[in-house]
């Protein structure tokens, strides 16, 4: 019974993290750009 209440409350608890979840898929693109800028800085050795 208590677990059912906790599971029901979970979506409300995760509303705080929705902006973070929206940003997460963009992070690999930033790593790709960082690698490109780093290679450009050292002259594509």
Curated annotation (Swiss-Prot):
Major site of localization recorded for this protein: plastid
Location within or outside the cell: Plastid, Chloroplast thylakoid membrane
Species whose genome carries this gene: Gracilaria tenuistipitata var. liui
Prodomain positions: 1-8
Transmembrane segments: 23-43
HAMAP family recorded: PSII_PsbK
Gene this protein is translated from: psbK
Quaternary structure and interacting proteins, as annotated: PSII is composed of 1 copy each of membrane proteins PsbA, PsbB, PsbC, PsbD, PsbE, PsbF, PsbH, PsbI, PsbJ, PsbK, PsbL, PsbM, PsbT, PsbX, PsbY, PsbZ, Psb30/Ycf12, at least 3 peripheral proteins of the oxygen-evolving complex and a large number of cofactors. It forms dimeric complexes.
UniProt keyword Plastid, yes or no: yes
Known function: One of the components of the core complex of photosystem II (PSII). PSII is a light-driven water:plastoquinone oxidoreductase that uses light energy to abstract electrons from H(2)O, generating O(2) and a proton gradient subsequently used for ATP formation. It consists of a core antenna complex that captures photons, and an electron transfer chain that converts photonic excitation into a charge separation.
Classification via InterPro entries: PSII_PsbK, PSII_PsbK_sf
Membrane-topology descriptor: Single-pass membrane protein
Protein name: Photosystem II reaction center protein K
